[in-house]
Amino acid sequence: MLRILSRKLLSSRLLLGLFLLALAATLQPAQAAKKESFRIAWSIYVGWMPWAYADEMGIVKKWADKYGIEIEVVQINDYIESINQFTAGAFDGTVMTNMDALSIPAGGGLDSTALIIGDFSNGNDGLVVKGEGDIAALKGKNVNLVELSVSHYLLARALDSAKLTERELTVVNTSDADMVAAYKTADVEAVVTWNPLLSEIAAEPGAKLLYTSADIPGEIIDMMVVNTEVLNDNPDFGKALVGAWYETMAVMSADDEAGKAARTFMGEKSGTDLAGYEAQLATTRMFYEPAEAIAFAKSEDLMKTMDVVRRFLFDHGILGEGAPSPDYVGMTFPSGATLGDQANTKLRFDADFMGMAAEGAL
């Protein structure tokens, strides 16, 4: 079965990614121009399966045709590789989390725009221990997780809640493919992982779910991120993507046969079935309506979250090569608020195109 939440792997090819980031700086001027053909990438995850449906059902083509452009939709099974390719100029947009948007394209110098805020994890990620105990009891223990992933971030937030630091325990880097088997061994005491692995581990006898992404709602965000220069030179590209997305949201969220068929398609395409996909939707806060995503984008909470995220990335040395402080990368928000060095603004949270969708102006 395919990994349902492959979005979270931070692969060992990070050095290659850093090279591509440096290369991107030379590619962008050539990219930024009026054009008629675009490419976007997506990878398997509950909140990104709508792109597969929108492509297969001709919804993306319908909206691209409306604006006289072409949009190619490409599935990339290696999530981090899809971001590396986006950063290097192979794609005009791709799906990614807020954390990865800041650390990879933005941290590497590519001016990027979060065009669509699709959802946030609301229980899809969790910390499980064997037996009784609380977060404070993790002190001195090993915790298995995919290092430098959102699982690592979730652990940091869990430790914050108990006034602990990573220095007081040991992080054991473990691949997602090995996580369930590792948990079943006698020497593994705690793991942090994501669904469907999380559900499988939490169902083991004696397993206790201590902390989940539902405890930090709105912090692990899933988005469609596009090249800012390409978007500025080709606003119809943004309009077509947003139009296709919210048409798909309307279909999949409906409590009718068409909605059920859409969710079934998305489940099967991601390697599960309707029940499995809907179980994952239950722990995902989807923004089916553009107004919901806009309110989230304009809230103070988003800026506060990104402040926490940038400090986590800086502390772990992945905010950008040679970043001197958490302020290294500048960010802008729809509220008008900013974070970081505005002379180096590389991540922009945008609500204008979602606003057009909300107003029926696409």
Locate predicted features:
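Bacterial N-terminal signal peptides that target proteins for export
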Residues: 2-16
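Bacterial N-terminal signal peptides
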Residues: 13-26
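Sec/Tat signal peptide C-region and signal peptidase I cleavage site
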Residues: 26-32
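Short, glycine-/small- and polar/acidic-enriched structural segments
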Residues: 33-173, 178, 189-195, 218
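Sec/Tat-exported extracytoplasmic proteins
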Residues: 64, 90, 95-98, 105-108, ...
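Pocket-lining segment of extracytoplasmic ligand-binding domains
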Residues: 178-274
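Secondary-structure end/capping motifs
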Residues: 232-322
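Conserved C-terminal helix/tail region of periplasmic/extracytoplasmic solute-binding proteins
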Residues: 309-362
